[in-house]
Amino acid sequence: MGVFLIIIGQCKPYTRCYIFVPLKIKIMENYKTPEQTKIGHVHLKVSNLDKALSFYRDLLGLEVTQYFGEDAVFLSAGGYHHHIALNTWYSKDAPKASPNTVGLYHVAFLYPTRRDLALIIKRLKDNDYPIIGGTDHGVSEAIYLTDPDGNGVELYWDRPKEQWPRAENGNLMMYNGFLDIEMLLKEI
């Protein structure tokens, strides 16, 4: 077992928290994450909860599943307890993070069909919300935007696995190609 530095402090919304900081990381040999493992949710620090809700709830259509006072909220698609959590515990009225620092690059939302992706793109366009990029990755088609705090957001759909581009040796061959958004909108 590695050596840990234990930091005891005040944490919101909890009264006390223990943070275990590894002083030396011991690598377990031959460990593989179970195949059924998924990323369950992302918890974002935001500067203004109302602006963040306007984006995630009102524009993208996520449903609020629970409020935690005036400082935090859980949102979901499809009845899950939460896919996105938003809080202002340490970030209320904070400036946007510089894009040239470490941290979150983007959160990606997987839509079930190409038509569903087209529908959200139309919604963004109808609301004059800026799309900052679009890419055909071979395995998927994606658009990119930012939330009110500058967090990157990817909206995409996956092609069926049997259509994914592969090399002769079977390796996946993703790429960054042109995405014709107007052609995609013809799905509607």
Label for each model-derived stretch:
Residues 7, 13-33, 38-47, 95-188:
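Vicinal oxygen chelate
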Residues 28-31, 92-97:
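Short beta-strand/turn micro-motifs at beta-sheet edges
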Residues 34, 44-89:
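Core segments of cupin and vicinal oxygen chelate
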Residues 88-91, 158:
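Acetyl-CoA-dependent GNAT
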